[in-house]
Swiss-Prot record:
Protein's name in the database: Replicase large subunit
Sequence segments annotated as region (Methyltransferase): 61-812
Keyword RNA-binding: yes
Catalytic activity entry: RNA(n) + a ribonucleoside 5'-triphosphate = RNA(n+1) + diphosphate; ATP + H2O = ADP + phosphate + H(+)
Length: 1828
């Protein structure tokens, strides 16, 4: 007989067969499977042995059994745990576990960090030899703690006795421990018990909260020591000690969360008991006392997720793991969340319950006092219960006795009978509970047997083949009067009323839950709380810095007075000055490094004085006055001496620059006056020669000092003697020139020191003191001849005079940082020159690599090498280094270009003054005239900041070529001179565009100082507002920036000035008050170290290198940088073409898109949208100018062929693409009048009324339209104007074609880009031309009902085969069990009988449910499934905070605040308007009402059910009996009380809504279409269609109060609000027909006067709180339906989780391309959106069977024709095909069915044929709210 292979496979796949086969083969020696299994076992064993070797071994030393050791190894698998069993003690297992826990927690902490061990065993820690530093806080809070301390000291003594050698580290610890103990004990004896008195290094006697021990970067741990520490106190202590992370453990049993009063701790062999708010822990077989702790404090560690310390620090509390009965937890500093804007958080915790195989079993006892049954529950093994049930189920009724069941349960308590043999079971039930278990089982079995008999009886009667008369009569009787007698019903009702539990309700077996849920929500407030440097108030920090500086200055002044005696004549500080008192004004830090003049004047800082006074190996020379005549010579000698002896290292010395400046000015005046009065008194020729020879000798000796030390020393002495003699007979002015020469020479030596070379003797002297005379370099650093020295002396007085009278601010641009403010400086310092730049063949690249400083030498150099970015870890560091490298490359490139221009000049390349020079260069010749003579021509503009000075030798070779800081004088009219002030240092001067500003040089050197500072650990958050041109970026800054706290940086100077003007106008302040509004260059050049700001507003940030943005953020200490920019306009441009930048683009953390422009006309907005350059949808504008762009090309009537074809317009702004075109156009137009010509790049960010863009060249360039980089330039060029733009181009490029195409665009399309209120109006469009072009396409009248039926059957197969006509009858006549709570039923009410009602017979067969009848079962079923099935919110909600935040957002986002009307709502006029809308019946009922207000029960409602069930659009009708909708409505008089006010409020709300926020107040499809007219179908949206379940019934107090607060904005007074809230809280509903009364908490009542409005705004407010609706382009709300459209690029989080956890809404988010709102699809039809009703609902309703006559059929026909009129347009049907396929997940094409449907719904005869009606149409009027 053949064997079926499928049966064999079925047998083989069984688990038992497989196990048996493997077992048989594996145990057979020699088989292949046996060998494989043995090899696998061997490998597994060897792997386990190897893993055990690498684990850390811990000897717990306690006397533990092998089972306990194995349990410890199982609980802590990362450790190899053994025991030497050398110690016995109390609860050994717990002690061993505590030791392992300590080791685990310590292993998670950095080894070199300090650790606070709360309640830790310091005796154990002190004996550690692992280098850890642990401080234990061990307070004595009870006698046991004191005993512990004594035992620990005994263990220390034992350790000392047993150890022959003690490691030095441990020995030092024990010594310190003993010293601290002696001190603590002495303090306690003296009754000193303050925290400071009990403090020690390794342990203290304080609580952790009071511990005064401090350690940097510390951690904390707590091993079973937090039970009695309040969680808040612990957090405060952690914050005070600046602890970021704490770990700990504590005993825990999940039974505590389940509410049990006692339980076991199985792994610890212990137990717990809860008593009077405390939990007691104890251990079995342990004589030691247990522990008692505060249960409430312990529960906080279990339930809390966050805890906020008093200083504002937020600690995140996490239960990391549970090992046995020990719970591990951590507290981590999470304050940064608040900085990132987190204001609320909720967490879900669940603790597993290890009782998966147990059952909750009920047992009963009789109370001896009350003789009542007492119910309790126990946990029993699932196997035990199942075996017991199986046994009792097999017993016959006579055998079902307590004896038999007791015997069985006792004999099989821990054994299982298998095949006649017993097998021991691990679990055993408490024998004392056997009798109670037996009782429950017997009663439960008897109950089940009775139910089985009843089922069998009824089933046998029903299953008979033959039907007799008695059976039918009996069945009829039961159908009519019910199967349950009235007597039994009454008794059951009475039992429910007295809470008498009976039947199966009394005995239920339930499974144990898998986990216990713990929830917690903590509010994170934004209140300022300074804490550990995380939340830093910059203003407070500035105040503290100023106080510190004032204190330091006072210390310095006092130090001057103290050491003046030591210095003797070195100090010039008067006694009166020492006693001066500082005034109370703010101190300005004006310190700078000490120079020569400071030492001579006695301005010596404290740190230098301390070192100086302590030294004895220096010169102690004296002088008669502050300015010694031999001072400079003595400095040189001192330098020689210091060079020969070991060097002295002095700390940096700072002086007050302000005081030094005042003294310097006074001395300059004195020198000038002295020079003038003695102008006729001079040296003789011989004396001058002798003096010059001495100075020349001095300079020569200094130059060769290092090579000839001994010779130089003697030479210096001789030179000093010579100068000393000359000083006696010569004027101070001459000596000053010598000093100046020495200073210049000395400065070169100082530069050499900066390059990193060996220090020279001159710098040694300079480290001690500097000259008091202002250094003025008037010649080359190599000047040494007597003639040049004499020339220098003659020029000195002139230079002093010119500089003293000059008002131009100058600054030293070559020193690293100018110490004194440039605003206060009146003396100019000529740039320093480095020795590294003397050699012509040495490039700046090599110099940069050694010194990181750019020299002043101008020469041709190679670009520096690219930095090694791999050294830097973060993107910000790489960008900053690249920015520095870029600046250096720019400087080197510019200098190379300048040097090339000079070389070309010397080579005779330039010879004609009429021809322009490169870079608008100009040469000044100082060899003929001291004022200089222009060689070729003047520059186009004066005022250059720098020039290039160079001198030539006799062979016309360059001897020196350096950058020079220029000064420009002004005439009496304030106009700048055409020539700069002669520096008299060079023969020629080059001026060029490259040297006009040269900000890069100063910025680079300042940023070098910034780089030296410590890198920030937390980078600023970069936010970009990516806006189209003219979107109001500067206006946004004006409205959001705080000019007193924030920093506003702009790339361009014009933008900065514009912002300053706006701020001055807004804040009524002067420009001097706006120092925080700067250009980026100005900030980095002058004030880079003077300001701090938490928020930086960076205008046009994308035009700057990313590294510059990061530098500004770091310098200011910013937390947030808000960048304004346009991602599509001209970005940062690399001006050094030979290098490639990798990190120039800014890394954005958050981007906000702005696509509304206020500048550009309508055609420009359409042009930008058409080009699709901007993501995020259509670009719209507020500028109503329709057409603004024109073009003139080479083939026009007046062709554009040259620059002379461009017309002149006085007020127009001319733009070109390149600088060369700019120059050509300027030259062509300047003769016609004043003209403004700029490049496109220069005008980015600017606005003009009329713009003329000019392209002169026909050759290609990458920035021209159509070029590789042309897009940004096209955008900027076309978006600068408000009124007009004309593009003159010599070639028909892409911009020419685009503008030409724009002239052909229809006006109606252009108008879609105009953003105004009227374009978004809900009740009509301003531009009627849109409707003219929107013509519908006629639908042919074809098709039959068969096509419709076929489509329906294919989409919803099986629905048409179900006949649900008798479903209501079966439900009403069959037994049904409905459990209801808070509900009563009056059995004396008449019971209705189901009636067979039929109407017209439809042609289509659909799942349209029949009309239900108002029967008790239907009413209770609807109550159960609707009102009683509402979800219950489990989370704790701070309602008032949520409501306040949400309503405030609603006021800003939903409404136009100017239209909000908050006047009185209940007026005579509003009441009359409401009265007129009421029906005649309602008015008659109200007129009969006689109750007064105080007699009304506002909490009483009527209850009924709707007869019509909502049709289901799925296949659920095939297996589900749907519940009817319920209606809960108050009396008419109550609606009359609230109705007028609610109606008025809803009208006010509708009128105050913003255009893009729509309140669907019963709108039809045409009205809905008007609300979406402004939306562009070409724009993609991210649509949110949310379906709420049980919406009305899910309402809580949060919804009710939120809507009330919203209504208060529109005039709802407090009395109405109170009454309305009262009527919605606890309510009683009653069904008079069926005698049902129920009680509801909250819920939206579906029949009150504001059901629709309350539903609408409940949903709207919930969605507003859960989603960023401020970013939505369109939103519409109506009842529980909503549709929200966001720009496509936005990523919006699914709101359903928050809606469920906070707003109690069960919902789901639909992700459809074709969205639906209120049963209508939103379709893209033509050039607009339109709403169209869902045809599937109509097809389903066409199967309705309860249409009774032709009148109702006519009414339905009228209603359908009105609502589905859009079906006449074939375009609608075409889009519906896609929507239906997507919505109903079908591949069927619905086109034919839709066409046939349209044919039958607009012709009454065809419509009537669908219901087999042959009558005529009945004239009727249908209300818009008609439903069928």
């Amino acid at each position: 007989m053949p064997i079926d292979s499928s049966s064999i496979l079925g047998i083989i796949s069984e688990e038992d067969v497989i196990r048996a086969a493997i077992s048989t083969s594996a145990t057979k020696f020699g088989s292949q499977l046996h060998s494989t299994v043995c090899d696998h076992v061997k490998e597994t064993y060897l792997d386990a042995v190897e893993r055990q070797k690498v684990k850390k071994k811990i000897d717990v030393r306690r006397d533990l059994s092998q089972e306990q050791l194995q349990l410890l190894n199982d609980l802590y698998p990362e450790r190899h745990i053994v025991s030497s069993n050398c110690e016995r003690g109390t609860h050994s297992f717990a002690a061993a576990s505590r030791k392992i826990e300590t080791d685990l927690l310590l292993s998670r902490i950095p080894k070199r960090s300090w650790v606070y061990d709360i309640g830790g065993n310091w005796a154990t820690h002190v004996k550690r030899n692992d280098g850890r530093k642990v401080h234990c806080c061990c307070p004595t809070v009870d006698i046991r703690d004191s005993a512990r301390k004594t035992v620990r000291w005994a263990s220390i003594e034992k350790y000392l006795d047993e150890k022959e050698e003690i490691p030095p580290e441990i020995g030092e610890r024990i010594k310190r421990l003993q010293a601290d103990e002696d001190r603590i004990y002495a303090n306690l004896k003296s009754e000193k018990a303050q925290p400071e008195d009990l403090d020690g290094k390794w342990y203290c006697g304080n609580r952790f909260e009071d511990c005064v021990f401090r350690a940097d970067r510390a951690y904390a741990m707590a091993i079973h020591s937090i039970y009695d520490i309040d969680l808040s106190d612990l957090a405060n202590a952690l914050e005070e000690k600046r602890i970021k992370v704490m770990s700990g453990t504590f005993l825990f049993s999940v039974d505590l969360l389940l509410g049990k009063k006692s339980g076991t701790l199985p792994t610890m062999d212990g137990f717990f008991e809860v008593e009077d708010g405390y939990v007691k822990y104890g251990f079995h077989n342990d004589t030691n006392p247990g522990y008692k702790h505060n249960l409430n404090q312990l529960m906080k560690y279990l339930t809390k997720t966050f805890v906020v310390a008093k200083g504002g620090t937020i600690y995140y509390l996490e239960l990391t793991e549970q090992r046995g009965d020990v719970m591990f937890f951590t507290m981590t500093d999470a304050t940064e969340a608040r900085m990132n804007g987190v204001v609320a958080d909720e967490s879900f915790k669940c603790i597993p319950i290890d009782n998966k195989d147990e059952v909750v079993f009920p047992i009963f006892e009789v109370d001896q006092k009350t003789d009542a049954l007492v119910f309790s529950e126990i946990l029993l093994s699932r196997d035990f219960v199942q075996r017991a049930i199986e046994y009792t189920g097999r017993l016959k009724p006579a055998q079902l006795t307590s004896d038999n069941v007791n015997t069985y349960l006792t004999s099989t308590n821990n054994t299982i009978i298998i095949g006649g043999s017993s097998k021991k079971n691990a679990t055993k039930v408490d024998a004392t509970l056997i009798q109670q278990i037996t009782t429950t089982l017997i009663v439960w079995t008897e109950l089940m047997n009775q139910r089985q008999k009843r089922v069998l009886e009824k089933l046998r009667m029903q299953m008979k083949d033959d039907v007799d008369f008695m059976t039918l009569a009996h069945a009829t009787f039961l159908k009519m009067f019910g199967k349950v007698s009235y007597y039994q019903r009454a008794l059951r009702c009475f039992a429910n009323w007295i809470s008498y539990v009976h039947g199966a309700d009394a005995i239920q077996f339930r499974n144990v839950p898998l986990y216990a849920e713990v929830t917690d929500r903590i509010k994170l407030w934004k209140n300022y709380a300074p804490n550990q440097g995380f939340v830093l108030d910059l203003e407070e920090l500035d105040v503290k810095i100023k106080l510190h500086e004032i204190t330091e200055r006072e210390k310095r002044d006092v130090s001057r007075c103290i050491v003046s005696g030591k210095l003797g004549e070195l100090s010039s500080v008067d006694n009166t000055e020492c006693g001066a008192v500082l005034d109370g004004k703010d101190y300005k830090d004006s310190r700078r490094k000490t120079t020569f003049e400071d030492l001579l004047d006695g301005e010596v800082a404290t740190n230098f004085l301390d070192n100086w006074c302590d030294k004895t190996d220096h010169f102690n020379f004296s002088r008669s006055d502050a300015v010694s005549k031999y001072a400079w010579g003595m400095k040189l000698l001192k330098g020689v001496w210091e060079f020969l002896l070991p060097p002295l290292h002095f700390a940096p010395v700072y002086v007050d620059a302000e005081q030094a400046r005042i003294r310097l000015n006074a001395e300059i005046v004195t020198v000038v006056e002295h020079a003038v009065t003695e102008s006729n008194v001079g040296l003789t020729g011989v004396e001058k020669a002798e003096f010059a020879d001495a100075m020349s000798f001095l300079v020569g000796a200094a130059k060769h000092l290092e090579k000839r030390k001994e010779v130089a020393q003697q030479a210096v002495v001789e030179a000093v003697e010579a100068v000393r003699e000359l000083r006696k007979v010569h004027s101070p002015a001459d000596v000053c020139n010598a000093v100046d020469l020495w200073s210049a020479f000395e400065k070169d030596l100082d530069d050499d020191d900066e390059t990193g070379t060996t220090a020279t003797i001159v710098e040694k002297g300079k480290a001690v003191c500097d000259d008091d005379v202002q250094v003025v370099l008037c010649g080359s650093s190599s000047t040494s001849s007597v003639e040049e020295v004499s020339k220098e002396a003659e020029l000195f007085v002139e230079t002093i005079e010119s500089q003293a009278s000059s008002v131009t601010e100058t600054s030293d641009v070559t020193t690293e940082v100018a110490a004194s403010s440039s605003d206060e400086s009146v003396m100019s310092e000529v740039p320093e020159k480095s020795w590294a730049s003397v050699a012509e063949d040495e490039s700046d690249d090599s110099y940069y690599l050694r010194s990181m400083i750019i020299s002043d030498k101008v020469q041709k150099s190679a670009l520096p090498k690219r930095p090694d970015f791999s050294k830097y870890s973060t993107l910000q560091q790489k960008a900053k280094q690249e920015a520095l490298w870029y600046l250096q490359c720019k400087i080197v490139s510019d200098r190379t270009t300048l040097r090339s221009i000079i070389d070309d000049h010397l080579r005779g390349m330039f010879h004609n003054g009429n021809c322009e020079l490169p870079k608008d260069s100009a040469f000044l010749d100082y060899t003929v005239d001291n004022c200089g003579t222009w060689m070729y021509g003047k520059p186009s503009r004066p005022g250059h900041s720098y020039g290039v000075g160079f001198s030539l030798d006799t062979k016309q070779r360059i001897t020196k070529c350096e950058l020079v800081k220029l000064m420009w004088n002004r005439d009496c009219r304030g106009q700048m001179n055409q020539k700069p002030v002669n520096t008299r240092a060079f023969q020629y001067l080059l001026l060029s565009d490259l040297s006009f500003m040269m900000n890069e040089l100063v910025i680079y050197r300042n940023l070098q100082q910034v780089v030296k500072k410590k890198e920030r650990t937390k980078q600023a958050r970069i936010t970009l507002r990516d806006g189209v041109p003219g979107c109001g970026k500067s206006t946004w800054i004006l409205n959001n920036a705080n000019p007193m706290k924030d920093m506003v940086l702009c790339v361009g100077k014009e933008a900065t000035e514009d912002l300053k003007e706006k701020f001055m106008k807004k804040h009524k302040c002067a420009e001097s008050d706006l120092k925080r509004i700067r250009t980026v260059d100005s900030f980095l050049m002058h004030d880079y170290d003077k300001f701090r700001a938490a928020t930086v507003h960076f205008d046009e940030a994308l035009m700057a290198h990313a590294g510059i943005v990061y530098f500004c953020a770091d310098i200011l200490g910013a937390k947030k940088v808000i960048c304004q920019g346009d991602s599509q306009q001209i970005p940062f441009i690399n001006r050094v073409e030979s290098i490639t930048l990798q990190y120039a683009k800014l890394a954005i953390d958050e981007t906000e898109y702005v696509r509304l422009t206020y500048r550009s006309p309508v055609d420009v907005a359409h042009y930008l949208t058409k080009k699709s350059w901007y993501s995020g949808g259509r670009v719209t504008t507020k500028n109503s100018v329709l057409r603004s762009m024109k073009v003139v090309g080479p083939r026009d009537a007046k062709p554009m062929t040259s620059v002379h074809c461009v017309p002149y317009h006085r007020d127009a702004q001319y733009l070109t693409f390149t600088q060369s075109e700019k120059a050509d156009l300027y030259k062509a137009l300047r003769a016609k009048g004043p003209v403004e010509v700029n490049t496109v790049h220069e005008t980015q960010g600017k606005t003009f009324d009329d713009v003329i863009v000019v392209r002169l060249k026909t050759t290609e360039n990458e920035i021209y339209p159509g070029g590789r980089k042309g897009q940004p330039y096209e955008i900027v060029a076309t978006t600068r104007h408000r009124r007009s733009l004309v593009y003159y181009t010599a070639i028909e490029d892409r911009l020419f074609e685009d503008i030409s195409d724009m002239q052909d665009v229809m006006e109606s399309k252009l108008m879609k880009n105009l953003c105004s209120e009227l374009t978004k109006x809900r009740f009509g469009s301003k531009y009627e031309s849109i409707l003219i072009c929107d013509r519908e396409v006629r639908v042919p009248d074809v098709g039959t009902p068969v096509i419709i039926q076929d489509f329906y059957d294919r989409v919803l197969p099986g629905n048409s085969t179900m006949d649900s006509h008798f479903d209501g009858y079966e439900v009403s006549t069959s037994d049904i069990s409905i459990e209801l709570e808070n509900c009563t039923v009056q059995p004396n009410k008449n019971v209705k009988v189901w009636q067979d009602k039929r109407g017209l017979v439809p042609v289509l067969r659909t799942a349209m449910p029949p009309k239900r009848q108002n029967l008790p079962v239907e009413a209770m079923l609807a109550l159960k499934k609707r009102n009683m099935a509402a979800p219950k919110l489990q989370e704790a909600v701070n309602e008032f905070e949520v409501i306040e935040r949400t309503v405030n957002r609603a006021k800003e986002i939903f409404f136009d605040t100017s239209l909000i009307d908050d006047s009185e709502v209940s007026t005579r006029e509003s009441n009359l308007r409401w009265w007129k809308r009421q029906s005649t019946t309602a008015k008659a009922q109200l007129k009969k009402e006689t109750r007064l207000l105080h007699e009304l029960d506002l909490c009483y409602y009527n209850y009924c059910i709707k007869g019509d069930e909502k049709p289901k659009m799925d296949r659920s009708p095939q297996h589900e009996y749907g519940a009817l909708q319920t209606v809960v409505f108050p009396d008419k008089i109550v609606n009359a009380l609230f109705g007028p006010a609610m109606k008025e409020i809803n009208e006010r709300i509708r009128l105050a809504l913003k255009p893009h926020v729509v309140y669907n107040s019963r709108m039809n499809a045409e009205e809905l279409n008007r609300t979406v007219e402004f939306l562009d179908p070409e724009e993609d949206f991210n649509a949110f269609e949310i379906d709420f379940s049980k919406f009305d019934k899910s309402k809580t107090s949060l919804h009710i109060r939120a809507v009330i607060e919203l209504y208060k904005l529109f005039g709802l007074n407090d009395l109405f609000a109170l009454l309305w809230e009262k009527s919605q809280c606890q309510t009683k509903i009653r069904d008079f027909v069926n005698g049902i009364t129920a009680y509801l908490l909250y819920q939206q009542k579906s029949g009150n006067c504001d059901t629709y409005g309350s539903n609408t705004w409940s949903a709207a407010l919930a969605l507003l709180e859960s989603m960023p609706l401020e970013k939505a382009k369109f939103m519409i709300f109506g009842g529980d339906d909503s549709l929200i459209l966001f720009p496509k690029h936005l990523t919006i989080e699914d709101p359903c989780r928050r809606l469920a956890s906070l707003w109690n809404f069960d919902c789901k988010l639909f992700d459809f391309k074709h969205n639906m709102f209120c049963g209508k699809f939103l379709l893209k039809v033509g050039d607009r959106f339109k709403f169209a009703p869902d045809p599937m609902k109509l097809i389903t309703k066409l199967g309705r069977k309860d249409i009774v006559d032709g009148r109702l059929l006519s009414e339905i026909f009228v209603s359908v024709g009105d609502n589905y009129r859009s079906y006449r347009d074939y375009r609608i049907l075409e889009q519906l095909t896609y929507a239906l396929r997507e919505r109903y997940r079908t591949t069927e094409d619905p086109t034919a069915a839709l066409v046939a449907l349209k044919k039958y719904i607009f012709d009454f005869k065809l419509w009537a044929s669908m219901f087999n009606y042959k009558g005529e149409f009945v004239e009727c009027r249908v209300d818009r709210n008609f439903e069928w």
